[in-house]
From Swiss-Prot:
It comes from Vibrio parahaemolyticus serotype O3:K6 (strain RIMD 2210633). Pfam families: Radical_SAM (PF04055), RlmN_N (PF21016). CDD domains: Radical_SAM. Disulfide bonds join C107-C344. Its main location: cytoplasm. The keyword RNA-binding does not apply. Reaction proceeds by a ping-pong mechanism involving intermediate methylation of a conserved cysteine residue. Specifically methylates position 2 of adenine 2503 in 23S rRNA and position 2 of adenine 37 in tRNAs. m2A2503 modification seems to play a crucial role in the proofreading step occurring at the peptidyl transferase center and thus would serve to optimize ribosomal fidelity. Its EC number is 2.1.1.192. This is Dual-specificity RNA methyltransferase RlmN. The gene is rlmN. It is an enzyme of class 2 (transferase). The keyword S-adenosyl-L-methionine applies.
Length: 375
């Protein structure tokens, strides 16, 4: 019988030091050295850790491994975006690299599928299987950094920002999200600025309250409707925590945060003739008057079987200008990677659906839905 090895990617600095002390009988500085090899140099072979003595390397090889998700498939967009299908166990999640002139952002998944049922999101149509482990969250960053490193000759920009906006609702995976964020921020890990790591939530108030005062990163909220009636129709989570509960929690978080500079980013996907008329814009402006924010409008990105459409450019423009009349800061997100289905709301993986959600959707809509495995 073989003992399963411990994946060192599952440990933040505190956990790594504790493991080294209790399981290996080693001092904290040895744990720190190994973390540097893993995250600063992308090393996954203990033999290549040249400042670690042979006895410890042998111990590590016997008990431990450094195992990140592997790339099952890579797709390259004409705009430079790369979408990777990352293998996690017997399923896939998607991770997206988005290069821009002054930065390169990595969009990271937190769940296999999604436990929520937002009506406009392709990931939600796949159902839900499980939360990702720490090693599977931070491992996406590790693997992407290595993939980009291998492409240095193409002049690709190193990862400067991470957004938890991939598959899944991050705040329903708090146990594994927090250590992964700690590694992203840690100087022994990826050493990213807290303003360059963003967590997006659809309104899990219990998770946001748990984050408050515990970890400081940029916050984005998926609002997508200016009133409870409409929001509950397109985002059922609103029946659990309504808009006012959600925004009160948001205000508590940004009051405790330096990363947000006193403001939250509001994400609002524009669905043609659903939530994009001028009345909705005025309602949204009024709703957000007591919550310092910048509003990011996201024109809907279509996917197979979706009942929604992208608004016309004129409707998008009118919506933005109406909000700006109320002195809100408003941007329209530039669509990136839509030619490889890597844009916002388009991410899908290889999900063994435990919720039976996909089967129900197929029965309701007909065959034109995203094909997934069902159990």
């Amino acid at each position: 019988m073989t003992t399963e090895k411990i994946n060192l990617l599952d440990f933040d600095r505190k956990g790594m030091r504790q493991f080294f002390a209790e399981e290996l009988g080693e001092k904290a500085f040895r744990a720190d050295q190994v973390m540097k090899w893993i995250y600063h140099f992308g090393v996954d072979d203990f033999d290549n850790m040249t400042n670690i003595n042979k006895k410890l390397r042998e111990k590590l090889q016997h008990k431990c491994e450094i195992k990140a998700p592997t790339v099952a498939e890579a797709q390259h967009s004409s705009d430079g975006t790369i979408k990777w299908a990352m293998k996690v166990g017997d399923q896939d999640v998607e991770t997206v690299y988005i290069p821009e002139e002054d930065r390169a952002t990595l969009c990271v998944s937190s769940q296999v599928g999604c436990a929520l049922e937002c009506k406009f999101c392709s990931t939600a149509q796949q159902g839900f299987n499980r939360n990702l482990k720490v090693s599977e969250i931070i491992g996406q960053v590790w693997r992407a950094a290595r993939e980009i490193g291998l492409q240095k000759e193409t002049g690709r920009r190193p990862i400067t920002n991470v957004v938890m906006m991939g598959m899944g609702e991050p705040l329903l995976n708090m146990k594994n999200l927090i250590p992964a964020l700690e590694i992203m921020l840690d100087d022994l890990g990826f050493g990213l600025s807290k303003r360059r790591v963003t967590v997006s939530t659809s309104g899990v108030v219990s998770g946001l309250d748990q984050m408050t005062g515990k970890i400081d990163v940029a916050l984005a909220i998926s609002l997508h409707a200016p009133n409870d009636k409409l929001r509950s129709e397109i985002m059922p989570i609103n029946d659990r925590w309504d808009i006012q509960d959600f925004l009160a929690s948001v205000r508590r978080y940004i009051a405790s945060s330096n990363a947000n500079r006193g403001k939250v980013t509001v994400e609002y996907v524009l669905l043609d003739h659903v939530n994009d008329d001028m009345g909705h814009a005025r309602e949204l402006a009024e709703l957000m008057k007591d919550t310092p924010c910048k509003i990011n409008l996201i024109p809907f990105n279509p996917y197979p079987g979706s009942p929604y459409k992208k608004p016309s450019n004129s409707r998008i423009d009118r919506f933005q200008k109406t909000l700006m009349q109320y002195e809100h800061t408003v941007t329209v997100r530039k669509t990136r990677g839509d030619d490889i289905d890597a844009a916002c709301g388009q991410l899908v993986g290889d999900v063994i659906d435990r919720t039976k959600r996909t089967a129900a959707l197929k029965a309701a809509r007909g065959a034109e839905t995203i094909d997934v495995k069902a159990v």
